[in-house]
Amino acid sequence: MASLEVFVLYLRIFFISFMSRARSLFSFVTSPAITAEHGKVQKLQAKPGSDRAPDSWIQYRHSKLVDPSTYNDLGLCGGLPLRVHKHAHLADKGARRAQEDWKRLVGPIRNFTGCLSPRFNGIAVAIPECIPERLEAVTYANEFAFLHDDILDTVGKEDGEEENNEMARGFESVLEPSRNVKMSVSGKSQMQAKLILELLDLDESQAMVLLKSWEGLVKGESGSQHFDFQSLDEYLPHRVVNLGQTFWFGIITFAMGLTVSNEEMELTKPITEPAYATLALANDFFSWEKEYVEFQGNPTSGNMANAVWIIMKEHSVDLEEAKVICQDKIRESCEEYRRRKREFELQSAEQVSIDAHRYLSALEFSISGNVVWSQYTERYHFHKPEHWRQVENVDDDGNKSDDSGIAMKDSPESTVVDVEDNVPSTFLNFGSSGTNIRSKKTLVSPVLETKLPEMTNQVVLAPFQYVSSLPSKKVRHHAIDALNIWFSVPEADLNMIKDAIDQLHNASLMLDDIEDNSPLRRGHPSTHMIYGISQTINSANNLFVMSLDTIRQLKSPDCLDVFISELKRLHIGQSLDLFWTSNVQCPTLEEYYKMVDYKTGGLFQMVAKLMGAKSPKSKRKVPDVSTLTTLFGRYFQIRDDYQNLMSKEYTDQKGFCEDLDEGKFSLPLIHCLTTSPNIRLQSILHQRKTMGKMSFETKKLVLDHLEETKSLEYTKEMLDCLHVRLHKELDVLEKQTGVNNFLLRLLLKRLHVK
């Protein structure tokens, strides 16, 4: 996927690899441990001793009942009703949009229709009570899962696992932003990022549950389609748990806006097992022809992960008899689910919330919807093309329409030991024994030896390795990946730029903590608290040399010029920050912003200029992102100023209002002193210099002053203003380049202070 648009759509989510052995829409389930609490759970108000469950836990606002005489469920659903969404056209819109994005970003689609069918859209009948505003996005997600699933059915084990791993990394970049996840730049990852952004915009907390569910599916199924199952009893639990529960649970709860706690999921898990078995078996039954064709076309596959195939092997029967057995199993599991659900409602209704009951009821519609939709979709009937050529406008139970309606929006003491000369000699050996080994020859006449062994770099690198190991959001890495949507820098050069920026950034962290006398860094002891000030300074200086050497390897005079120029500016900015603190001199707002442009924004400016120098594009096609990186640097620094005073996470990682201990003139403090000069506050700052820190009580007093002058409110307003301006600048750049940057938009969303 070397095209620009493929790279562009990729970066916008640190999300990025959205896969799903969506063996089908309807065979997914969730692990209880992944659900999130979203406030107080509404408990049932049923009367004690109630001898019957409510007829329905769901209020039908968004769907209508389909006349059973107009469809045939083959007797597989035990009489479960079929409902269809009133805005099914939104589901069609989401499916078509996903297919268009795939063709544009990934490649051609063959023999694929996904959720679409001439009569019913799969999501419209599987989740008929989906919140209308979420229907298009949910269908897009399921369509994307189908497309990914089709890849898995046509590749070998290693390629399939890599497809899943790529998708998992995309989820991890959002769910675990502190991890240094290596992002893919494929078109599929761009689609994943785009989708994640849409889901987060609709409902961030519930979207995170869905993303975690999807991640669990991807990780659980990796390589599972290549398992050699010998019996249905062996296959089905694996199919249900690893290829079903996580994804579909996340889809249903997000689509319907349900909040189901971990405890409720544990309690209802035995109830839902036969429901997911029904979905899995039905999917395998209807998708048999499709999967068998793909199986025959893939010589690397030795077995099919399909219930019909396994029944044929287990019982030594032909295809038709295996299908009959499979149908019987579907009916049995469906009836078992209905029995367990009724029993649970009668005996344990008050133990869970209404939303948990709604989830259980929603599964019934997923069962009937899956069975009926599967009979219409050419996904499983591609050998009958007359069923599908174009989606019709239907003003019946399918409710298809052109009206869009709703937009989707180191080392212990050592000892010298004499050994024979054939033992390798080294001056430092950090072995587990803590013993340094030297030869007799070395002990006798080292002063005359001019070709002594090279010294290890372990000591000089130890502080760097320590600070690198601390938790980090890897914002700079994500920013580089996002910008590369526009610059298209080759991967080898891009990695060297990342390495150089990492080395500079970590050097600045070590020196900053010394200069600010900060004992904590990201909730851990600062580097100089472990290795001492002198060793830390030396290690930081070494990093500057290492970064220069890395830039040299880019073999570009322009890159060297950029590196030296921006490094000078970075040190100038830091010198001003230190000068104001040391002399208790409050800068003007203009001086503060310019300092930020030099210091914090310097690395972002360096990144953009280095990427511009190494871009294979002509200079007129390389976008000017200087305004964007300047604004981003300001937003990043002001956000840090604000969070240092207001965020519990910052308090846990660095200490309570650590900027006040350091005497740093942050934006809130500058605003306070500028708008309402205060002798008491100025005296506090001078005393801080004398004492080296502030007491807890004094910090509270400073915060009171900041509140009185509305300086914290002002800082938040500046953040909001910058956030809006950043999006406008992003709009301009996307228009100029013709490439959307979803990864950069996702990064801005992650950094947004609410």
Curated annotation (Swiss-Prot):
Binding locations of Mg(2+) 2: 149, 153
UniProt-annotated binding residues for Mg(2+) 4: 512, 516
Uses described in the biotechnology field: Asperterpenoids A and B, but not the final product asperterpenoid C, exhibit potent inhibitory activity against Mycobacterium tuberculosis protein tyrosine phosphatase B with IC(50) values of 3 to 6 uM.
Geranylfarnesyl diphosphate synthase as annotated region, ranges: 389-753
Pathway(s) annotated for this protein in UniProt: Secondary metabolite biosynthesis; terpenoid biosynthesis
Enzyme class: lyase
Region listing for Sesterterpene synthase, in residue ranges: 58-388
Binding site for Mg(2+) 3: 512, 516
Gene3D superfamilies per record: Farnesyl Diphosphate Synthase
Residue numbers binding Mg(2+) 1: 149, 153
Region (Disordered) location: 392-414
Signal peptide coordinates: 1-24
Swiss-Prot/TrEMBL GO biological process terms: alcohol biosynthetic process; mycotoxin biosynthetic process; terpenoid biosynthetic process
A GO term, aspect molecular function: prenyltransferase activity
CDD domains reported for this sequence: Trans_IPPS_HT
Biased composition (Basic and acidic residues): 392-403
InterPro entries (alphabetical): Isoprenoid_synthase_dom_sf, Polyprenyl_synt, Polyprenyl_synt_CS
Catalytic activity field: (2E,6E,10E,14E)-geranylfarnesyl diphosphate = preasperterpenoid A + diphosphate
Function, as annotated: Bifunctional sesterterpene synthase; part of the gene cluster that mediates the biosynthesis of the asperterpenoids, sesterterpenes that exhibit anti-tuberculosis activity. The first step of the pathway is performed by the sesterterpene synthase astC that possesses both prenyl transferase and terpene cyclase activity, converting isopentenyl diphosphate and dimethylallyl diphosphate into geranylfarnesyl diphosphate (GFPP) and further converting GFPP into preasperterpenoid A, respectively.
Family assignment from sequence similarity: In the N-terminal section; belongs to the terpene synthase family. In the C-terminal section; belongs to the FPP/GGPP synthase family.
Name this protein carries in UniProt: Bifunctional sesterterpene synthase astC
Biological source species: Talaromyces wortmannii
Lineage: Eukaryota, Fungi, Dikarya, Ascomycota, Pezizomycotina
Gene that specifies this protein: astC
